[in-house]
């Protein structure tokens, strides 16, 4: 590998929207993410239920169907 052409590899602080922070290595010093393993439904085991039935009823009521 040639010297002096690669970006510097530094410690990186990753901050999530949920408030979780952790350290890793990257060529950037700081990263901000929306979802991490602390709040992602796959890792937490929780499901986000969408109330589609309620939305349909609201639509039908609004347009008198």
Swiss-Prot record:
PROSITE patterns referenced in this protein's UniProt entry, alphabetically: RIBOSOMAL_L31
One Gene Ontology cellular component: ribosome
GO MF, one example: rRNA binding
InterPro entries assigned: Ribosomal_bL28/bL31-like_sf, Ribosomal_bL31, Ribosomal_bL31_A, Ribosomal_bL31_sf
Cofactor: Zn(2+)
Key words, A-Z: Metal-binding, Ribonucleoprotein, Ribosomal protein, RNA-binding, rRNA-binding, Zinc
Cofactor note: Binds 1 zinc ion per subunit.
Swiss-Prot/TrEMBL GO biological process terms: translation
Chain positions recorded as Zn(2+) binding sites: 16, 18, 36, 39
Similarity annotation: Belongs to the bacterial ribosomal protein bL31 family. Type A subfamily.
Function description: Binds the 23S rRNA.
NCBIfam families for this protein: L31 (TIGR00105), PRK00019.1 (NF000612), PRK00528.1 (NF001809)
HAMAP family (UniProt xref): Ribosomal_bL31_1
Subunit structure: Part of the 50S ribosomal subunit.
Protein name: Large ribosomal subunit protein bL31
Organism, scientific name: Campylobacter jejuni subsp. doylei (strain ATCC BAA-1458 / RM4099 / 269.97)
């Amino acid at each position: 590998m040639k010297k002096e052409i690669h970006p510097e590899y530094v410690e990186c602080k990753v901050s999530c929207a949920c408030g979780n922070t952790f350290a890793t290595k990257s060529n950037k010093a700081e990263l901000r993410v929306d979802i991490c393993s602390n709040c992602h439904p796959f890792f937490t085991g929780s499901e986000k239920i969408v109330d589609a039935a309620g939305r349909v009823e609201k639509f039908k009521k609004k347009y008198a169907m």
